């Protein structure tokens, strides 16, 4: 009985040792869905009560984007366009080759600022969702966001397709045609 007990302890020790050796750092964070391009930087941005928020939109779209940030319990003050330190900027820009779709965005996080650029409010919304995934609690009501450069655009023109084959019977050729149209 003593040999089995010792064998179990050795196996448990080796398993724990293996788990410790294969643990990875949180620097390479995952984002769902995976962005088109993501490059890690050095350092991190500290999102806190002192961080300012600048949005170059007016009205309902600006209010909806501000509401997205309420997922984090940090109250951000209003900022100005000329602010460059400790600011989160959401900017609508001209359509260009980097932002081919209305849902495309670029997200740049440096230790000084966070900048999300898009050609529409939809792109800013998806950039905000990515930012919320990157935010890690760092204590005392603040969040740490690792420095990163992200460019993202939708891979497909449609976000989803529903085929109800239980009530509306379709041929195999029809379903293949629908999938091919995506």
Predicted segments with their positions:
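Ala/Thr-enriched low-complexity intrinsically disordered regions
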Residues: 8, 22-23
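N-terminal secretory signal peptides that target proteins for export/translocation
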Residues: 1-7
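An exposure/low-complexity boundary signal
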Residues: 15, 22, 175-178
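Substrate-binding cleft of carbohydrate-active enzyme catalytic domains
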Residues: 155-182
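A detector of low-complexity, intrinsically disordered, Ser/Thr/Gly/Pro/Ala-rich segments
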Residues: 1, 17-20
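Acidic, contiguous N-terminal accessory segments
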Residues: 12-17, 24-159
